[in-house]
Regions:
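RecA-like P-loop NTPase motor core
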Residues: 76-83, 94-202, 207-211, 224
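Switch/communication elements of ASCE P-loop NTPase nucleotide-binding domains
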Residues: 14-136
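Coupling/switch/interface segments within P-loop NTPase motor domains and analogous charged loops
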Residues: 1-5
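Activity-critical C-terminal alpha-helical subdomain
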Residues: 206-257
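A short acidic, often aromatic-flanked loop/helix-cap motif at beta-alpha or helix-coil junctions
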Residues: 11, 113-115, 182-186, 230-238
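Charged, alpha-helix-enriched surfaces in structured cytosolic catalytic cores
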Residues: 66, 70, 91, 148, ...
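A short acidic, amphipathic alpha-helical/loop segment
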Residues: 70, 189-193, 214-218
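Non-catalytic substrate-recognition/targeting regions of SAM-dependent transferases
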Residues: 7-9, 13
């Protein structure tokens, strides 16, 4: 019985027709952007002995958050003691920043016609901000809030201003940092860490507990700003003193939900 087969002598196959295939039979050149980047990261790590330096621009490009984390792991982001590669990468992704330590992060600033590279450092203030609020390192300005209540209050004001036709604080390159409550010194320490890296910083705290002597003054002298209430009062005190009864009833009803 005759069969329809290719004539090997009449078919021209060039170099471009030969490609590596994966386990599922898909040509590797047909992989998506994210899969291709993961493959390249693995190859780069395997060749680290002869090519120990890697350059990655916009590391988050084409990668979902979970794959971005895997990509950074492949490049040795968690192997701080003995990294397999020396990697220079740029990013605008808070997911990528959260996976790094402060010792791996450098902030680049244009200054007087040239650029200054500042190491973020490994202080507790830098590391805790990286884990909880990495967006702060991608912003121009940061409001360091004493706790979650202050963050919510600031966000609410921002939304009200947007509804009134003003530009959003976030659209202007701003971010919020939650200092986690406690002493106001915590907020000043977080703020000072960002201030030293060239960010514009405002600390938003209650006025019921004083900071350590000289802490607030040193922060302001370094270029920081402080927003607080009248002496001895907190956010909750001011709200219950000045909001109308209807608004207070709404707040209490929300708290009971």
């Amino acid at each position: 019985m005759p069969q329809a087969l290719l004539d090997a002598h009449s078919v021209s196959i060039g170099d471009g027709a030969i490609a590596l295939h994966g386990e599922t039979g898909i040509p590797l050149r047909s992989l998506g952007t994210g899969s291709s980047r993961l493959l390249v990261a693995g190859l780069q790590r395997a060749a680290a002995g002869s090519a120990p330096i890697a350059l990655v621009d916009e590391v988050e490009y084409g990668l979902e958050p979970h794959r971005l984390m895997r990509f950074l792991d492949s490049l040795g982001a968690k192997e701080v003691a003995a990294p397999p590669l020396q990697v220079f990468l740029t990013t605008h992704s808070p997911v990528a920043l959260r996976e790094l330590s402060g010792g791996q992060l450098f902030v680049v600033r244009p200054t007087g016609g040239h650029h200054v590279v500042k190491p973020a450092g490994t202080s507790n203030e830098v590391q805790s901000t990286l884990r909880a609020d990495p967006e702060a390192f991608l912003a121009k300005s940061a409001i360091v809030c004493e706790g979650a209540s202050e963050v919510g209050f600031a966000r609410g004001l921002d939304q009200a201003w947007v509804q009134a036709g003003q530009r959003s604080f976030l659209a202007l390159g701003g971010s919020y940092v939650n200092a986690g409550g406690g002493s106001p010194d915590n907020s000043f320490a977080r703020g000072a860490a960002l201030l030293n890296l060239g960010y514009r910083v405002l600390v938003f705290i209650d006025a019921d507990k004083p900071s350590a002597p000289g802490v607030a003054e040193a922060f302001v002298a370094a270029g920081g700003q402080v927003l607080t209430w009248r002496h001895g009062l907190t956010l909750e005190d001011e709200m219950f003193r000045h909001l109308p009864d209807a608004s207070l009833d709404s707040l209490l009803a929300k708290a009971e939900e």
